Amino acid sequence: MSTTPTIPTIKLNSGYEMPLVGFGCWKVTNATAADQIYNAIKTGYRLFDGAEDYGNEKEVGEGINRAIKEGLVKREELFITSKLWNNFHDPKNVETALNKTLSDLNLDYVDLFLIHFPIAFKFVPIEEKYPPGFYCGDGDNFHYEDVPLLDTWKALEKLVEAGKIKSIGISNFTGALIYDLIRGATIKPAVLQIEHHPYLQQPKLIEYVQKAGIAITGYSSFGPQSFLELESKRALNTPTLFEHETIKLIADKHGKSPAQVLLRWATQRNIAVIPKSNNPERLAQNLSVVDFDLTKDDLDNIAKLDIGLRFNDPWDWDNIPIFV
């Protein structure tokens, strides 16, 4: 097996180790996913962050299983994340959704399973539409179910006990929701995944969560960049972080790319990152973000960029008040 970069890990409260740098599967096309995952494993990636809602878990699984079959990696060396979508929050539907994920990935277990959003949409049978996305069984109209988050969480805890999930966690949760969930949970969330970039830094949330012993993964590390292809008006009207003078100056000083600076800004504070790339050179670059340190001045200057600008807000879907 070829020499691959050694990626630092975060020790989770569940006892498992999660790589600090991974490969994000959001918006990876069905046509390219298997090859991209396979090539990422060859490059040295071991954490793959997927979700039911991404609609590409079959192809992601093909890439993973090809690499395992060829001896590039063992299953236990990989850290595979998936996420429970909003239509499957009712406890009686949680295992059905997980089984679909495991079947698509062609794996016996996932290392981490997150509640994707603290929102319960109306259940949609898998045979009717999968992944359902925003479909709630009635055209473009949103419909919801009265399912408390703790009920969904208890169903996930049972699946940990059954050996189908190693660690469970949450995504897009606020501090108050986390505070409440911890008080009813038997198994504490191992990971919180949040939108995290210099325009949206959330320092108080990060301080609270890390002190509570919960690891953090940041998504959309490049800020508006992730949302340009979705034609988000907010993203289109925001200067890219790659071109921001502060980021460019820091990158030049360290002889690194702006992307590497943005990723190191997170990993240096023990926040995992999950960028993706089709480009082999950038794939390797994104993995090489632990071999330099930003100075206190660098960190202070990046801190000044925080404007509380969120690009992934369910209020834009149907006035869903998670972040209001």
UniProtKB/Swiss-Prot annotation:
Recorded catalytic activity of this chain's protein: xylitol + NAD(+) = D-xylose + NADH + H(+); xylitol + NADP(+) = D-xylose + NADPH + H(+)
Pfam families on file: Aldo_ket_red
Gene Ontology MF terms in the entry: D-xylose reductase (NADPH) activity
The protein's Enzyme Commission number: 1.1.1.307
Residues the record lists as binding substrate: H116
An example Gene Ontology biological process: D-xylose catabolic process
Binding site for NAD(+): 171-172, 220-229, 276-286
Active site: Y54 (proton donor)
PROSITE patterns for the chain: ALDOKETO_REDUCTASE_1 (PS00798), ALDOKETO_REDUCTASE_2 (PS00062), ALDOKETO_REDUCTASE_3 (PS00063)
Alphabetical list of SUPFAM superfamilies matching this protein: NAD(P)-linked oxidoreductase
Positions marked as site (Lowers pKa of active site Tyr): K83
Pathway: Carbohydrate metabolism; D-xylose degradation
InterPro entries linked: AKR, AKR2B1, Aldo/ket_reductase_CS, NADP_OxRdtase_dom, NADP_OxRdtase_dom_sf
Annotated TM spans: none
Keywords assigned by UniProt, alphabetized: Carbohydrate metabolism, NAD, NADP, Oxidoreductase, Xylose metabolism
Family: Belongs to the aldo/keto reductase family.
Purpose of the protein: Reduces D-xylose into xylitol. Has a preference for NADPH, but can also utilize NADH as cosubstrate.
Protein name (database record): NAD(P)H-dependent D-xylose reductase I,II
Protein source organism: Candida tropicalis
